[in-house]
């Protein structure tokens, strides 16, 4: 059975203007789309932090680059993400999806150079037993820095490459990768295809924005689709909404 890794951006499932506020309509629509997918495919879901994780991360000065050894602060960020994860799990369970949590803080770590180590034995066994693992952006122990943030995008790349995903979907509030005129680029097979629109470099992309995302997705062995909420049903149906990123 084929494997799909699907990321739900934090801005899709939360109200990013209000701390720790779920976007009930957005989450319901996302869960409605995931349910039929889980009936016919093996699925791993990843969700972003939205107004849960980002609020606490900013308060405690923790980012993907800046770490902390303050256990109380690290727990505050992680606990907020668990609350959002519970909301996502509940929405999926209400639709008959056998969803289980996988918390990155307990599952992985970063090396001193920032490379992510994410053992996948537990996730793979969940899939084999018919469960839908649900991961999330989180704090993660980082050699030499205490704990830093691991983004949902980083998790998607590790999961897709480590588990051999057949398709990857990233649903956010933008309809795809946009060109300089604001139009969706249908397909990217090399970074040069989008370099002008993305500024040609991700050197200033400290939060892991679109340029960094495109570079990472080009390295995958599976096609990755970047789309907005309106494209989620099409992706689930096997179509190619938004931008497809396919490294050659």
UniProtKB/Swiss-Prot annotation:
Organism: Haloferax volcanii (strain ATCC 29605 / DSM 3757 / JCM 8879 / NBRC 14742 / NCIMB 2012 / VKM B-1768 / DS2)
Sites annotated Transition state stabilizer: 16
Cited SUPFAM superfamilies: Carbamate kinase-like
Record function comment: Catalyzes the phosphorylation of isopentenyl phosphate (IP) to isopentenyl diphosphate (IPP). Functions in an alternate mevalonate (MVA) pathway leading to IPP, a key precursor for the biosynthesis of isoprenoid compounds such as archaeal membrane lipids.
Positions that bind substrate: 49, 54, 152
CDD domains associated with the record: AAK_FomA-like
EC number assigned by the record: 2.7.4.26
Top-level EC class: transferase
Protein name stated in the entry: Isopentenyl phosphate kinase
Gene Ontology CC: cytosol
Annotated family: Belongs to the isopentenyl phosphate kinase family.
Record GO biological process: terpenoid biosynthetic process
Keyword Ribosomal protein: no
UniProt xrefs under InterPro entries: AceGlu_kinase-like_sf, Asp/Glu/Uridylate_kinase, Fosfomycin_R_FomA-type
Subunit note: Homodimer.
Pfam families: AA_kinase
Record's catalysed reaction(s): isopentenyl phosphate + ATP = isopentenyl diphosphate + ADP
One Gene Ontology term of the molecular function aspect: isopentenyl phosphate kinase activity
Record: residues binding ATP: 7-11, 50, 209, 213
UniProt keyword annotation of Cytoplasm present: no
């Amino acid at each position: 059975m084929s494997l799909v890794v699907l990321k739900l951006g934090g801005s899709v499932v939360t109200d990013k203007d209000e701390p720790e506020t779920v976007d009930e309509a957005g989450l319901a629509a996302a869960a409605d789309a995931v349910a039929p997918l889980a009936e016919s495919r093996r699925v791993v879901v990843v969700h972003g932090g939205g107004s849960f994780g980002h609020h606490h991360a900013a308060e405690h000065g923790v980012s993907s680059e800046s770490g902390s050894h303050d256990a109380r602060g690290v727990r505050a960020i992680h606990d907020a993400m668990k609350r959002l994860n519970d909301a996502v799990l509940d929405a999926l369970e209400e639709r008959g999806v056998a969803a289980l949590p996988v918390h990155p803080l307990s599952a992985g770590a970063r090396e001193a150079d920032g490379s992510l180590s994410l053992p996948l034995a537990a996730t793979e066994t969940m899939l084999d037993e018919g469960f839908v693992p649900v991961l999330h952006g989180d704090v993660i122990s980082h050699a030499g820095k205490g704990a830093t943030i691991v983004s949902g995008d980083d998790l998607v790349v590790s999961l897709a490459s480590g588990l051999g995903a057949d398709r990857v979907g990233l649903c956010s509030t933008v309809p795809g990768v946009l060109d300089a005129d604001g139009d969706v680029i249908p397909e990217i097979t090399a970074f040069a295809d989008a370099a002008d629109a993305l500024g040609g470099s991700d050197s200033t992309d400290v939060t892991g924005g679109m340029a960094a995302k495109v570079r990472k997705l080009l390295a995958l062995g599976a096609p990755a689709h970047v789309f907005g909420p309106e494209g989620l049903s099409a992706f689930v149906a096997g179509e190619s909404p938004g931008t497809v990123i396919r490294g050659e």
